[in-house]
A protein has these predicted regions:
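Positively charged n-region of N-terminal signal peptides that target proteins for export
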Residues: 1-4, 18-19
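Sec-dependent signal peptide hydrophobic core
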Residues: 5-9
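C-terminal motif of bacterial Sec signal peptides marking the signal peptidase cleavage site
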Residues: 13-16
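Compositionally biased intrinsically disordered regions enriched in Thr/Gly
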Residues: 18-218
Length: 218
């Protein structure tokens, strides 16, 4: 995974931002944890399979904002988080996590908020066999004005982000003036891809994060 921090002033200068209205909808949290394990016997050895989910459930008088955060964490079809993750855990133990030493750990946490927005981070690891676990990490920012996601639709032309992201990757992860490395690792702007995940806001930066193998094979 690659987490890219872009100064917010640079983003606003380059592409513009439409939301300016303020509000004071404070979001508190109600922590929820679901954790269990089962003992599995196999011809290769006996051990436990583990499942853990930690969630900062939103508590706010802004019902639209609360519902949209829950839909992002769960789905559009339910707000019953206990039943949703109980079913997810049962499915994990029955399918991917039915081998010794398997595990799944997920976290949805409230990262920060201002009068304008609230940002959540989702991260975790899963291991169901093979050489290494599968990690994930991404964020999302919701407007406190109308509860909407403040992602790519914030920008008049998201394609302009490609050049900014490419230069930010080069600055944060690679030594300057390494021409050979740049030749192998950086695509031309016309073929450079934006990440699948929406960008989000952290304090003084806009953040984009590429998933495993999304822009590289190693």
């Amino acid at each position: 995974m690659r987490k890219i921090l872009i100064p917010i002033a640079l983003l606003l200068l380059a592409v513009g931002c439409n939301r300016t209205k303020t509000t004071s909808n404070e979001v508190d949290i109600n922590p929820f944890t679901l954790s269990d394990s089962i003992f599995i016997e196999s011809e290769f050895g006996d051990d436990y399979s583990h499942y853990t989910m930690n969630i900062d459930l939103p508590v706010t008088d802004n019902d639209t904002l609360r519902q949209n955060i829950l839909k992002w964490i769960l789905s559009d079809n339910t707000d019953d988080y206990e039943a949703y993750f109980q079913e997810d855990m049962n499915r994990f133990f029955a399918e991917e996590g039915n081998e010794p030493n398997s595990f799944f750990e997920g976290n949805y946490s409230l990262s920060e908020q201002t009068d304008l927005y609230v940002t959540y981070i989702a991260e975790g690891y899963a291991y169901t066999g093979g050489a290494h676990p599968l990690p994930w990490y991404y964020g999302i920012t919701f407007s406190k004005t109308d509860g909407s996601i403040m992602g790519y639709d914030l920008f008049e032309n998201p394609e302009q982000l490609k050049g900014i992201i490419s230069k930010s990757i080069e600055k944060q992860y690679f030594e300057p003036n390494n021409t050979e490395e740049e030749e192998y690792l950086f695509e031309p702007d016309e073929t450079f891809q934006l990440p699948t995940n929406e960008p989000w806001i952290e304090t003084d930066s806009g953040v984009v994060c590429y998933g495993p193998f999304e822009i590289a094979t190693c």
